[in-house]
């Protein structure tokens, strides 16, 4: 079949398709059919060079209301908020807008002086956020007043030499504004009294922020051509997502700890791989039973799904030192249902002996047969072994995800397929495929106009042959039917 299609002239293919399309005029078509058949497909081109929005970092000691303030500024619940110190652990970026201006908002974990263990790593992340920011909101609990930890934050901010706006949070009414005056002693000028929980004073604060921020970021102020392709790293907790992101970025971008579920918010990072910029999203591990998850873990699982929806390609990380679980399969299904391109990354492959590798290959063939079309990369998130193989796999998946088949070629393919493998006769009737068109890409979706319903098995057969013939590797594809009858036919 592939040879016959290759030998077919494009003009001849389009002529055949036009003949088949004309034949549809004898059938009852609705407005949606007509729109689909007459619509012209156009891919979005590159947006050209663009400058990065200015960056505003929010910093303070644990549990002063930083994430609550983030949600208030964004006008929606994005940052994970819980009345427990330390819920935000990484520096997390969000796109924000105020009075017609865009800026990037960075939420950070609580900064603590001389912190130990994971808290020390959280503090380092907060300091890195300050380095990459154009201005900083220093949030202090007005009800508590300045503490020794606040003074430690003050010293760190002074060394950074960044513009700092002092925010006195938890000022719920006018009577409490006097408490904020005591914060003058921290040396950053007049504190802005706000209530992040109720929104009091936040508008005035943002007006001042807009006066402080530059038009474009002066820190990372390079121009990027087009928009970087967006990649979601997903997988069950503690599978190595954060370690992989850090290895790719070449820095400790995400807090890594043996404790499962350390990453709670989606974390975006622009990473240079294969001479191009990619936007990676490292997400919290998807929990086993979302409806049973409590507090921060519940909201983090929702954030993970939201990040997947915003991505273009999902890299599903699977640990080869553990048996493939139902949870792994469910996560894969979630990626497929989202319609994103897909790459499978098998972590810790370098630790396997030959016998275990042979066993795992058989296990993959059995348990992952439904995603045999996805490119596979065997890597080590910890050491970076084979990390260079990710880019070719991502390219293959995204090219397939973007691909569009000319209508003439598609109908020539369908004609060859049906001639060689006609649909089985059911109840004395044999449904025919009248015409086919690709309704969209990202992911590729095809619509077949037919005279009757096609068996599920036959539709799977068409899908499989579409993959083989046109090279749809790394993307889910969808084949839908529109059953139509001839005009004037008695029912």
From Swiss-Prot:
Gene3D superfamilies: 3.30.300.20, P-loop containing nucleotide triphosphate hydrolases. GO terms for molecular function: ATP hydrolysis activity; GTP binding; ribosome binding. Residues 403-485 form the KH-like domain. Coiled coil: none annotated. GTP 1 binds at residues 60-67, 107-111, 169-172. GTP 2 binds at residues 235-242, 282-286, 347-350. Keywords: GTP-binding, Nucleotide-binding, Repeat, Ribosome biogenesis. It holds the Pfam family MMR_HSR1. It comes from the Bacteria. Residues 54-217, 229-402 form the EngA-type G domain. One of its GO terms (biological process) is ribosome biogenesis. PANTHER family: GTPASE DER (PTHR43834:SF6). Belongs to the TRAFAC class TrmE-Era-EngA-EngB-Septin-like GTPase superfamily. EngA (Der) GTPase family. GTPase that plays an essential role in the late steps of ribosome biogenesis. Associates with the 50S ribosomal subunit. This is GTPase Der.
